[in-house]
Design a protein with these regions (language model features):
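Short hydrophobic segments within beta-strands
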Residues: 6-7, 29, 60-62
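Glycine-rich adenosine-cofactor-binding loop
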Residues: 2-20
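A generic structural motif
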Residues: 23-27
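Phosphate-bearing ligand-interacting subdomains
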Residues: 33-131
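Short, polar loop motifs at secondary-structure junctions
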Residues: 10, 29-35
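Conserved SAM-binding loop
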Residues: 32, 142-149
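Extended, small-residue-rich solenoid/repeat segments and analogous flexible loops
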Residues: 132-133, 141-143
Length: 149
């Protein structure tokens, strides 16, 4: 059973450590780290180190939406396709995991796909609500062309 590497060592990474369980997390990964850093006793590894060991672990991206998208692009660019956006699983612990152990749940390819799908679905719904708000509160006939200033 693969343990978890949390990509992101900030506030959301610390929250993910608590939610996913310290016993299930091997370490953190951060693009901006020094090799001696630890958080809650967990080492913080560099992205370069992650590239060497990623096949042995589950990567959970524990960052805000903008940074999650940047890290997804970074991982995909380096050929890493198996990752789980934390924003795609947070809040589902009791509803989805149920009696299953978190590692058992997250090690399933089907559940990893569910987390990715859920992340993009929530992102879409958020953008849709912003567009709906804009449509309800603006008059397109009063918009002027951009001047570049």
């Amino acid at each position: 059973m693969k343990k978890i590497i949390l990509f992101g060592s900030g506030h959301m990474g610390r929250d993910a450590l608590h939610v996913l369980g310290e016993e299930n997390v091997y370490c953190y990964c951060d693009n901006y780290t020094n090799s001696s850093k630890k958080i809650k006793g967990k080492p913080v590894i560099s992205y370069r180190k992650l590239l060497q060991i990623y096949n042995e672990y589950l990567i959970v991206i524990s960052l805000n939406e903008v940074n999650t998208d940047n890290v997804i692009a970074q991982l995909e660019n380096d050929g890493i396709r198996e990752y789980i956006p934390y924003l795609g699983i947070v809040g589902f612990k009791t509803k989805v995991w149920g009696e299953k152990d978190v590692l058992t749940y997250l090690n399933s390819t089907e559940n990893q796909c569910f987390a990715q799908t859920n992340y993009y679905k929530n992102k879409y719904l958020h953008e849709k609500s912003k567009l709906q708000y804009l449509m309800e509160h603006s008059d397109i006939t009063k918009l002027l062309p951009a001047t570049g200033e």
